[in-house]
């Protein structure tokens, strides 16, 4: 299961509502991401993948960007997207700690790599936390094996077209919702 958490109270949401489907079918290949550094089944965890779709927004400055990091922005445009998330969670929901760690996949090699998970997995697994990896950048969907890891390191759409061919990412300026 996936939960979207937010505050109640009759206010306008800061982010447009997303639709989540899944878990996805296995497809013709393994999940496209670096595998967990431990066998998840031996520690009572499972890995599932979900598709997330909705409307993403790009933003533009509303005035000058100051050095304090407190910037005001306006919505510049919006467009549909469909991406995926990878979830590693305790198989037994009673072990869930209530903490969800969300990682924006690193795409320096033009594919999804869970760099942070590699360093914090011991604590996540020991404590019963849920880890969610997010495909947040366009290149990890569209890469054709031209990254630093070579021709076999393909973006999602090329890795498994049957499973990932419907993913749509309008570009990195839409990555922040």
Where do the PLM segments sit?
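Cap/lid segment of the alpha/beta-hydrolase catalytic domain
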Residues: 105-109, 121-177
């Amino acid at each position: 299961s996936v939960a979207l958490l937010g505050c109640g109270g009759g206010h306008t949401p800061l982010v447009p509502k997303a639709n989540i489907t899944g878990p996805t079918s296995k497809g013709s290949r393994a999940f496209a991401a670096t595998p967990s550094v431990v066998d998840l089944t031996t520690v009572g965890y499972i890995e599932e993948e979900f598709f997330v779709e909705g409307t993403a927004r790009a933003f533009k400055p509303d005035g000058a960007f100051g050095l304090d990091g407190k910037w005001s922005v306006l919505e510049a445009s919006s467009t549909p997207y469909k991406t995926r998330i990878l979830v590693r969670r305790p198989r037994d929901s009673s072990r869930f700690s209530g903490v969800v760690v969300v990682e924006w996949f690193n795409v320096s090699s033009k594919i999804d790599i869970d760099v942070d998970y590699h360093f914090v997995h011991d604590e996540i697994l020991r404590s019963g936390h849920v880890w969610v990896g997010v495909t947040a950048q366009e290149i990890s969907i569209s890469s054709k094996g031209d990254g630093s890891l070579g021709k076999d390191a393909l973006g999602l759409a090329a890795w498994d077209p049957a499973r990932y061919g419907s993913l749509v990412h309008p570009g990195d300026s839409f990555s922040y919702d």
